[in-house]
Regions:
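Feature responds to low-complexity, polar/acidic, surface-exposed segments characteristic
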Residues: 32-57, 70-118, 126-146, 154-182, ...
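A short amphipathic alpha-helical interaction element
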Residues: 60-63, 88, 92, 123, ...
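Intrinsically disordered, low-complexity segments enriched in glycine/proline and serine/threonine
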Residues: 9, 177-180, 187
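Conserved "repeat-terminator" motif of extracellular CCP/Sushi domains
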Residues: 9-10, 21-26, 91, 119, ...
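Thrombospondin type-1
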Residues: 1-39
Length: 198
């Protein structure tokens, strides 16, 4: 979107979207098409809820309807915001009904009385998370794909699921970048269709 000059040089133009369409190049961005606001759409309460044909719309509706996610404010969901390590653990803790925690906080970077404190303690008690080493959990760090796969793998084991399911990572050209700790969880997550390529 912009002006092409001699020699194929390009001056970038500023995209301006109206109803999900760029007024300069007419490119469509489903994330910028507002939700229809139908009362049957749980995410319609968020001003930034993407359109129904956006790939994550149904998943957002599900987590909002089941009170697993509450948005970043009363009116925003921020669908492009990265999931933090604290967030993924909090989701699982909420899914479990937020049981009482009895153990001590094993991580020196998890402060008391934060929105995720009990979730992290619970996850550590049940061997769902083990931290990143040196007594740290890194609650605000981005949850990488292999970390999410590992946390879900340990949660499934905690729930008593059959873990003898193995997928094939050989179809991914970057499989060599998977950390040793995450190889088994990643093959499991692929087999369970929890993770696919990008």
């Amino acid at each position: 979107c912009g002006t092409t000059l001699e020699g194929s040089k390009r001056i970038p133009a500023r995209h301006h979207y109206v109803g999900g369409y760029c007024t300069v190049c007419e490119r469509q961005d489903p994330l910028r098409i507002p939700c229809s606001g139908d009362q049957h759409c749980p995410g319609h309460i968020f001003s930034d809820m993407p359109s129904t044909d956006y790939w994550s719309h149904g998943a957002i509706d599900y987590v909002v309807a089941h009170k697993l996610f509450f948005g970043t404010s009363a009116t925003t969901f921020e669908p492009r915001t990265k999931l933090s390590r604290a967030m993924i653990v909090k989701v699982l803790y909420t899914l479990e009904g937020e049981p009482a925690v009895t153990g001590e906080n094993p991580f020196r970077d998890v402060a008391d009385n934060r929105w995720y404190t009990n979730a992290v303690i619970w996850a550590a008690e049940n061997k769902i998370v083990a931290g990143i080493g040196d007594g740290k959990f890194d609650p605000d760090g981005d949850a990488t794909r292999e970390q999410v796969a590992t946390i879900l793998y340990e949660y499934a084991a905690f729930k008593g699921c059959d873990m003898n399911v193995y997928g094939d990572l050989s179809t991914f050209t970057d499989m060599g970048k998977v950390s040793n700790f995450a190889k088994e969880p990643m093959t499991w997550a692929v087999a369970e269709s929890l993770i696919s390529g990008v």
